[in-house]
Amino acid sequence: MNPSTTQARVVVDELIRGGVRDVVLCPGSRNAPLAFALQDADRSGRIRLHVRIDERTAGFLAIGLAVGAGAPACVAMTSGTAVANLGPAVVETNYARVPLIVLSANRPYELLGTGANQTMEQLGYFGTQVRATISLGLAEDAHERLDSLNASWRSATCRMLAAAMGSRTANAGPVHFDIPLREPLVPDPDPHGAVTPPGRPEGRPWTYTPPVTFDQPLEIDLSADTVVIAGHGAGVHPNLVQLPTIAEPTAPAAPSGGNPLHPLALPLLRPRQVIMLGRPTLHRPVSALLADPEVPVFALTTGPRWPDVSGNSQATGTRAIVTGTPNPSWLDRCAQMNRHAVAAVREQLAAHPLTTGLHVAAAVAGALRPGDQLVLGASNPVRDAALVGLDTAGLRVRSNRGVAGIDGTVSTAIGAALGYERDHHGRTVALIGDLTFVHDSSGLLIGPTEPTPRQLTIVVSNDNGGGIFELLEQGDPRFSDVSSRIFGTPHDVDVGALCRAYHVENRQIEVDQLPAALDEPGSGLRVLEVKADRSSLRQLHAAIKAAL
């Protein structure tokens, strides 16, 4: 067995021992030893391999696999620009704390700076965006040192896994595992008895690192009028369930008996303190409250970092030790304002003459059932889901909130469905906008030999452009002569034709047909397109606020 083949097989074996169950592979020549090793592992049932031709979409597919299955995912590619195309996925997983292993092949280091083809300084390319960067030395044809090399390779692989999963830091994220490979890059005809150097007995990892316990209790007096803001990555806090809580869709669902608070109700109240869980990213009234120097903020997070955009947090921790008792009149008033806000949204949606993204979100939210997984686009869809009062009880809600880009969302949804279906029988529904869909339409390319989701429906709310800008300062009527082109970016793409090009089932329906369409029995991947209007979004949101 040649050295590159041996090294690749050892690394793949140790990744599997460390918990990797899904690997996305992008084709190339330099990463051939890894590709052969991964194919062998897939054929033997040790991993599930997903082959993709585009490294950018492959990275987001791996993100979806990781969050859907709750396990580290790996994406493997060749050298050069193939590595650079992982940049967006690496940045997203850094801030979203998703365990992603970028497994790149490299040229032998003596070729750097020589003008050799497809060669660049890729070690360290991701800089501070990764938790760790490790390069294995070139595999040597030294049988007498094989035991030592085996130990070194397996130890390095375990170090990568520990960094990716945050086993010693409580801060999961991406890592870059770079492996220079020398020719021959394809397996030799194995001599009789040639075997991969073994790992630990009984399939154990070479170096086991138990997950760190990160616990910082923080005492908080609840006698002041308190609201809870639960953002992305919020933990579960049963002792705060009675407090009025603005929960973003990706926050854990509140237990029964919770006290939900609609985000539009917040300006109608005067909280005296805030408990912030995770990282809020969606609502301007929330940002304004967190920036109010007169309102103390207590930040509870599940890792070592905490958000504090305005510098207003007074204390941080991981869980609350509560004292004092909430004022019943405060709880009652919050519940009343929540009902008022929910009713205002519902009434204005019913009165509005045109279909908007909010109407599509409301239809999707009403059609979901316990056990479903929901993937939301990072622009208007995740905000619309919050505004229409999505009930997340019994659901798993995903959205790329790390840096909240629209890129890679189709691939993330496909990966999330594939990952979720490993251990769950529920379906996956994705709600995304048309720009998000078009931006990552190449994610629809799933080869005929590749795993396909059992039940994934992508709902495209198509208002022919960037509807979110209608609601921002750029959408002010005084910019109407230019904003549609430079912010709205209409594209006139035929979504159905695009789906047909990738052999994906699709149809265009009206918003009132959406619940029935989502309930239809079926399998595989399909796209439901709902035409929506964005020109009246500003008017609709103004009407909702006026009704409050």
From Swiss-Prot:
It is an enzyme of class 2 (transferase). Its EC number is 2.2.1.9. Belongs to the TPP enzyme family. MenD subfamily. Pathway: Quinol/quinone metabolism; 1,4-dihydroxy-2-naphthoate biosynthesis; 1,4-dihydroxy-2-naphthoate from chorismate: step 2/7; Quinol/quinone metabolism; menaquinone biosynthesis. It catalyses: isochorismate + 2-oxoglutarate + H(+) = 5-enolpyruvoyl-6-hydroxy-2-succinyl-cyclohex-3-ene-1-carboxylate + CO2. The keyword Glycoprotein does not apply. The keyword Transferase applies. This is 2-succinyl-5-enolpyruvyl-6-hydroxy-3-cyclohexene-1-carboxylate synthase. One of its GO terms (molecular function) is thiamine pyrophosphate binding. Its cofactor is Mg(2+); Mn(2+); thiamine diphosphate. Keywords: Magnesium, Manganese, Menaquinone biosynthesis, Metal-binding, Thiamine pyrophosphate, Transferase. CDD domains: TPP_PYR_MenD, TPP_SHCHC_synthase. One of its GO terms (biological process) is menaquinone biosynthetic process. Catalyzes the thiamine diphosphate-dependent decarboxylation of 2-oxoglutarate and the subsequent addition of the resulting succinic semialdehyde-thiamine pyrophosphate anion to isochorismate to yield 2-succinyl-5-enolpyruvyl-6-hydroxy-3-cyclohexene-1-carboxylate (SEPHCHC). Binds 1 thiamine pyrophosphate per subunit. Homodimer.
